[in-house]
Amino acid sequence: MLDENHAARRRTRNSRRDPELTRWEILEAAVQEFATHGPRGARTEDIAHRTNTSKRMIFYYFGSKEGLYRAVLEENYRRIRALESSLRLDHL
C-alpha cells in the first residue's frame, strides 16, 4: 500500500536505493509478515528477502525486531487515525 509519491519513485534494479523508500518497503513487508505470523512467528529473514535487503538493513533502520514491530504498530495506528478523521460524523 505505497502512497502515490512512493510508487512514483520506485527504483529500477540498476539504480541506487532511496533510503526513505527502502525503509518504507521494509515497513510494508513487515506489516504483512506480522499480520500473518504474529510478533513471535514473524521472521526478519523473510522480510529482508521480500524487500531484497538484508537483516542488517532492517536493524539499521529499526534497531531490532522489537523496534520494527513498534514501527508497524505506529504505522497501523496512523492509518486508523487517518481513516477515522475521514469519517463524516457531523450528523451523529
What is each residue range found by the language model?
Residues 25, 29-36, 82-90:
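Solvent-exposed, amphipathic alpha-helical segments
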Residues 13-17, 21, 63, 67, ...:
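Residues at secondary-structure transition points
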Residues 7-12, 54-56, 84:
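A short small-residue
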Residues 70-92:
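Amphipathic alpha-helical linker/stalk segments
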